C-alpha cells in the first residue's frame, strides 16, 4: 500500500494576525504617548527656568538702582511698566514687588505687574528708611502642564551705599 503522506501546511490564522496587529498598535501608541509626556515635561521645565530668570532679572534691575530711586514709589512703578526681560514667558506671568524697611518694617510698598503689563500700586509704606530695605520679587503663572498655579520668589536686602 502506497500512501502519500499528508503534510499539514503551517500558517497563521486571521485571529493571530489581528492579535499581533493590536499588540503592535498598542506598543507604538504607548511610545508616542510617552514622547508627548516627555515634551510636556520639557515645556514645564522651560517655564520654570524662564520664571527663575525673570525673577532674577527684575531683582538685578532693582538692586542696581540708586537707593533714592529704589525708595521712590513712582520711579519703581514706572520701571515696572516694562517687562523684566524680552522672553515670551513675561507675557503670561504676574510680577509682585514688595519693598519694606529692614529690619523693622513700617509698612510695605507693593506693586503688581499683570501679564498684560498693567502696573498697580497695592500699598505704599509710610517710611522705607534710609539705610536698608528688603526687596521681595515674586512671579506667579499658570503652568502649561496640568494648569497648576506656580510661583518663584527671591528676597534681597539692599543697603544705601556706594556702587562700585
Predicted regions and their residues:
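Low-complexity, Gly/Pro-rich coil/beta segments used as flexible assembly/activation regions
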Residues: 45-164
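Aliphatic-rich helix starts adjacent to a transmembrane/signal segment
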Residues: 8, 12-56, 65
Amino acid at each position: 500500500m502506497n500512501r502519500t503522506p499528508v503534510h499539514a501546511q503551517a500558517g497563521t490564522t486571521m485571529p493571530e494576525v489581528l492579535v499581533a496587529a493590536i499588540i503592535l498598535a498598542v506598543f507604538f501608541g504607548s511610545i508616542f504617548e510617552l514622547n508627548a509626556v516627555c515634551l510636556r515635561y520639557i515645556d514645564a521645565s522651560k517655564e520654570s527656568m524662564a520664571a527663575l530668570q525673570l525673577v532674577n532679572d527684575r531683582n538685578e534691575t532693582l538692586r542696581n538702582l540708586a537707593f533714592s530711586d529704589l525708595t521712590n514709589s513712582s520711579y519703581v512703578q514706572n520701571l515696572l511698566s516694562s517687562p523684566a526681560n524680552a522672553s515670551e514667558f513675561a507675557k503670561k506671568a504676574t510680577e509682585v514687588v514688595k519693598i519694606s524697611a529692614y529690619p523693622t518694617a513700617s509698612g510695605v510698598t507693593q506693586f503688581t505687574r499683570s501679564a498684560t503689563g498693567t502696573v498697580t500700586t497695592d500699598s505704599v509704606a509710610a517710611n522705607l528708611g534710609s539705610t536698608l530695605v528688603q526687596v521681595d520679587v515674586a512671579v506667579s503663572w499658570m503652568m502649561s502642564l496640568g494648569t497648576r498655579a506656580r510661583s518663584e520668589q527671591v528676597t534681597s536686602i539692599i543697603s544705601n551705599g556706594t556702587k562700585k
